[in-house]
Amino acid sequence: MALANEEDMEAFFSDVVRYRPQELNQLASVTKFSRREIQHIYRGFKQECPLGTVDEDRFKHLFSQFFPFGDATKYAQFVFGTFCPPGTNIINFEEFLSSLSLVARGSLHDKIAWIFSLYDINHDGFITKHEMTEVVSAIYELLGHAIEPVLDAGSVERHVNAVFDLIDTNGDGVITLDEMERWCTRDEGNTKSLDMLNTVW
């Protein structure tokens, strides 16, 4: 039997490792996106991630294209952590779509839970002041020159202290999901801020 040429081998291995997503109807039934929206999202995903999966480095690169005036690396890492299943370092299309659906089209509780998971960096069920500082610093880095006046470490610390003390109602030094949910839903302004996720994503 003759050996396959190099192009045939590349095509074979490409087919072997390429991830195949679920059927369109199935994806539409488990997310809050229409079939047309899923097709549109998949086209963009496949163009940027032709193998059907994305690792953290690739995710950071893609994310940074939306924020050219700042450094999106750290914030993208935190977002990736909320999308990526525990113990893995890769996202397939279903996982990406499910997370996107939750953030963009989920209930108010879904959105609050996602925000909580973003700040709960070590996933222990609590947000510490250190974790909040890490994420807020990443947001400032992400926005870069768009922030005026330019903020320093002292600004970040003051911002975190003010917000943390508002949410940590029992003063035990950590924020729980319940405290986060109570704070986010206590007035209309906070709720409207969460509704902006519908258009941001």
What residue spans do the PLM features occupy?
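Cytosolic, low-complexity regulatory segments enriched in Ser/Pro/Gly with interspersed Lys/Arg
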Residues: 1-28, 32
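C-terminal interaction modules of eukaryotic adaptor/scaffold proteins
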Residues: 11, 25, 157, 171-201
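N-terminal low-complexity tails and the immediately adjacent first alpha-helix
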Residues: 34-36
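Primarily EF-hand calcium-binding motifs
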Residues: 38-56, 62-67, 73-101, 109-123, ...
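HEAT-repeat alpha-solenoid elements in large eukaryotic scaffold proteins
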Residues: 53-57, 136-139
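Conserved beta-strand elements of beta-rich interaction domains across eukaryotes
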Residues: 61, 66-67, 98, 104, ...
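A contiguous pocket-lining binding segment that forms or flanks enzyme active sites
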Residues: 115-138
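Strongly charged, low-complexity linkers/loops
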Residues: 136-157
